[in-house]
Amino acid sequence: MAVQESAAQLSMTLKVQEYPTLKVPYETLNKRFRAAQKNIDRETSHVTMVVAELEKTLSSCPAVDSVVSLLDGVVEKLSVLKRKAVESIQAEDESAKLCKRRIEHLKEHSSDQPAAANMWKKKRMDRMMVEHLLRCGYYNTAVKLARQSGIEDLVNIEMFLTAKEVEESLERQETMTCLAWCHDNKSRLRKMKSCLEFSLRIQEFIELIRQNKRLDAVRHARKHFSQAEGSQLDEVRQVMGMLAFPSDTHISPYKDLLDPARWRMLIQQFRYDNYRLHQLGNNSVFTITLQAGLSAIKTPQCYKEDGSSKNPDCPVCSKSLNKLAQPLPMAHCANSRLVCKISGDVMNENNPPMMLPNGYVYGYNSLLSIRQDDKVICPRTKEVFNFSQAEKVYIM
């Protein structure tokens, strides 16, 4: 029964932690399937049109040259259809194989062989680190770690490298790469009600104002803002007011609109939409796992000012993680466990807690082990007491 519960808990942990591992390649497969369907439907309609034209021509006793020309057109369209179909199927097959490879990898966690299970845990840790490094912008380090660990097909490097290109273009104050990304994911972004493309068009308008190309800015507004409504319409009205002010104005809100820091806001907006598009959280799995682990073992003893109650074996008590865990909640413990300061053993009915006259509590077995001539020395205060002075503690 305990084994079944442990397996169920592990399965639930995998579902929570490994969701991005399967979701990202699945979304890529889904996207390629839809693109393939559109391409094949489009090319099929082209073939149907030229075949219909050929049939219409044949019904009126045409010249041989015109028939040959139409047949060449049919052959050309069929060749294009075949090429597009092969390319689409290959792309889908690659994504399907990647999904299968990751599923097989996740199944390895239930191996009965300790060595295989430990290897799988190491790979999972490496995968978490690679994703965290990619999120932090350490792309070269992440790629090297993935290559050395042999997990290149188990992490979402391609997605983050694509995002890197978009973010770098926005840092250069260019919008074309990000707009192309919006076009590639147009249907999904529309379902998400993303306003990233609108924000990019607003920024293009602002840059035209900055360059004093006001007629171009008006043409740009007519082309891209004619369908604006709701809150977007209010924003359009605001930026249109920039036409009446010089590009170096100090009047709000136009001064804020001309602030180059808006490009950093666009990067943050793209990053947010990119994570939503692939159904990823704002924090990496590594960060979430680390915070959950620290919170699970965090106690008030880890933050005593005198430092006397800190445990050298406790990660939260360590200098590097103590500050990191400070804003996290304390461990939830329905049933307290008393641990002896001397031996580290749990104090229970077989090792009852004993309180010395100075108020410090130790396990009975530990006091026996340090007793000399019926005397015990408190490890904390170095005070000496008779063994008989120790009193049993009862927890209500």
From Swiss-Prot:
Its main location: cytoplasm. Residues 1-124 are annotated as: Extracellular and involved in cell to cell contact. Keywords: Actin-binding, Cell cycle, Cell division, Cell membrane, Cytoplasm, Cytoskeleton, Erythrocyte maturation, Membrane, Metal-binding, Nucleus, Transferase, Ubl conjugation pathway, Zinc, Zinc-finger. Its EC number is 2.3.2.27. Residues 159-216 form the CTLH domain. It comes from the Eukaryota. GO terms for biological process: cell adhesion; cell division; cytoskeleton organization; enucleate erythrocyte development; erythrocyte maturation; negative regulation of myeloid cell apoptotic process; proteasome-mediated ubiquitin-dependent protein catabolic process. Pfam families: CTLH (PF10607). It is found in: Cytoplasm; Nucleus, Nucleoplasm; Nucleus matrix; Cell membrane. Identified in the CTLH complex that contains at least MAEA, RMND5A, GID8, WDR26, and RANBP9 and/or RANBP10 as the catalytic core. Interacts with F-actin. This is E3 ubiquitin-protein transferase MAEA.
